[in-house]
Swiss-Prot record:
InterPro entries: SLX4IP. Signal peptide: none annotated. It holds the Pfam family UPF0492. Residues 181-306 are annotated as: Disordered. Residues 276-292 have a biased composition (Polar residues). Belongs to the SLX4IP family. Transmembrane segments: none annotated. This is Protein SLX4IP.
Amino acid sequence: MNKLVVKCGNFAVLVDLQVLPQGTSKDTSWFSDHEKEEVCTLVRDTLDSRVKEYLDSRRQPGQLKRKEYTQASPLILKGNRLRIAAYFIKRWVKLRCVVKRQYRELHVFPDRFVVCASQLEPASSVWVTEAAATLKESCSSGTSEYFAQPKGIEMTNLLTTPAQAVLKNIVRKTKITKDISDEAERDSRMSPSLGLADTGKADANNIQKALSKAQPEEKRAEEPNDYINTENSLGLPVPEVENDVNHRQPSEASSQQKPQCAELKTQDLSKHLSRLSDSAKQTQSLRASVMQQKRRRHSSEGKERCKKSCLTSDTFIQQGMQRNEAQVKDLEHVPLASQTDPVRHVSADRGDTLPSKPAAIISVASKQQQGALSLFSNIHTEQSVKAVLAPLLNKDLP
């Protein structure tokens, strides 16, 4: 461990320098006086700022907050040849400087500064120098490396990835078609006695599976078509273009099958609409029949009610006529003398006059005559009403 003393104002900061060996061997010969000077220059600014913060904290205690560099979170700095990690350790013992008269005002800083130095790798240093050189060249020329490349190389780099994706999709489609054909041949060989219907069903199922697998791949393949067109415009060789066209045939076949699927969907929709219209017609016919039955029931009930009312009116009229005839007969037997000569009996005790029995009989008879006349008038009115309603009752109600 090496010890250094760095003067910062009136304070002397003690620095404990630890040099890490290079590689697996414990060789520290790489650290020389030149590296020691470089460490002092790297650490100078941090030490000055720390001394200034210490003085400010003594003048105004509890107001300033400084950043603490500890062993867990050290200060890391890089130089041209080395890299250092530094941190402060508080010293609990006060030290004094025993010096000559000219250094009487010099004090020892209360914190100890520990520095660990390690050599940079040569590759990294070379890379840093090369990067700095390239940056200087680019700044001097005013153009970057991206624009310095030729345009043909850029276009090929852009087109390689989508072209590879398209070729992979084409290979997958061809494999799917080959697998379907092989399965169909195997089915035909294994079951020849089943007939053409079973083989047709198997082929249809296989085709549907292939279409369901190929649809997402087609969507992926449709995206980089622009890149393919640009590649063709750049001038690909003729055999590659022919192979690309030959590989695209399954996608064209699938595109021909797409309108057939659309036609089948339209046919299914038309059938469904026709079924709905038929069901609507049936419901309308049922509603009409139900309404007709209700009307017939109401008409029959109305006829029965009219007949009942007519019968009741006839019976009432007959009973009234019989009563009137009986009252008329009773009046015929009453003598005329009793009707013309009323006799009044005066009571001895009271001064009022009371009608005799013949007078009471006459008053009753007159009342009966009035009732008979009212009955005859009612009979005539009921007969006229019956004559008016008879033709209406004979007709059929709608």
